[in-house]
A protein has these predicted regions:
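HIT superfamily nucleotide-processing domains
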Residues: 1-123
């Protein structure tokens, strides 16, 4: 994609990285994955908040989330999923001001270790 004026990482994703896509959103691999298969679902339109998306975008993102879940279950057989919305500019980085949904596969006997990206400061 062409660079946009706001230099958003999610607006400028590489088509080569796309796992799946529809008219309103895309599934991408999370570059700093917390577990095997960790992915993000993003709306194609640069938008800051889940509460600002249209009904069509909401349905599209839900469809992509379900598709990602089904594909991850098939490929990696996780025990479950941690699903998190990053809504608003809460972390102060270039990605956080573009709404995105993390789908993080959870595996038996593998604790989820969150870091400062999630507002968690290690002791």
């Amino acid at each position: 994609m062409a660079m946009t004026k706001h230099e958003c990482t999610y607006c400028n994703f590489d088509e080569y990285d796309v796992i799946d896509k529809n008219d309103y959103g895309v599934i991408l691999p999370e570059p700093n994955a917390l577990t095997k298969g960790h992915s993000v679902i993003i709306p194609l339109r640069h938008i800051n908040s889940f509460f600002e998306i249209t009904d069509k975008e909401r349905k599209s993102l839900q469809s992509l989330l379900e598709l990602a879940r089904n594909e991850l279950k098939l490929r990696h057989q996780p025990e479950g999923f941690h699903i998190a919305f990053n809504d608003g500019d809460v972390f102060g980085d270039a990605q956080s001001d573009h709404l995105h949904i993390h789908i993080i596969p959870r595996y038996k006997n593998q604790p989820l270790k969150l870091d400062s990206r999630w507002g968690i400061i290690s002791d």
